[in-house]
Amino acid sequence: MVHITTVMIIIGAYLIGSIPFGFLLAYFWKGIDIRKCGSGNIGATNVWRTLGKVPGMIVLILDMIKGISAVLLAKQLENTDIAVLGVALAVMAGHSWPLWLRFKGGKIIATGAGAILALSPMPLLLAFLVWLTTVVVSRYVSLGSILGAVSLPIWMALLNQNRHYLIFSVLVASFAVWKHSSNIGRLIKGTEFKIGQKKT
């Protein structure tokens, strides 16, 4: 039976995930609606592309903190797989479908990475290395995000992680690929934005 505490912290995690740091920072930093710039996404990559490295890094860190804080809170209050994984999914759902922006948000990568870091650091570190290698070689952040996400359940399996965490990582990878469907289309067409490419 699911405890009322579990339900409450899952709702709380969704609300934490819904905080649109990219949107807020762009508005207060430069008075713009980040949804009308670049890719239209509120995540760190689009903020970086539109406003520069410093704002992009700030959003990246804040979005990761959403995932980390929600999962750590769940572990403190209700340390069961149902509660912890429910909270991890909820904080990512909040980031992707934020209540405050009419359910149009980011692509879960930063917030998801924060949640997984709090769940199981080593698979996340290995997935990050896949992301980093891909980005350095190709200069495509989106491709790195896709391959890093896809590699996550592989690392979970190879490192014999909790079965529930493995299932969770498969869901995260599938969701990340789906959220990047437009990026995949641009990658195929050769029109995806590269690091170092001048804004047009």
Curated annotation (Swiss-Prot):
Keywords: Cell membrane, Lipid biosynthesis, Lipid metabolism, Membrane, Phospholipid biosynthesis, Phospholipid metabolism, Transferase, Transmembrane, Transmembrane helix. Its main location: membrane. It is a multi-pass membrane protein. The keyword Lyase does not apply. Pathway: Lipid metabolism; phospholipid metabolism. It holds the Pfam family G3P_acyltransf. GO terms for molecular function: acyl-phosphate glycerol-3-phosphate acyltransferase activity. GO terms for biological process: phospholipid biosynthetic process. It is an enzyme of class 2 (transferase). Its EC number is 2.3.1.275. Probably interacts with PlsX. This is Glycerol-3-phosphate acyltransferase.
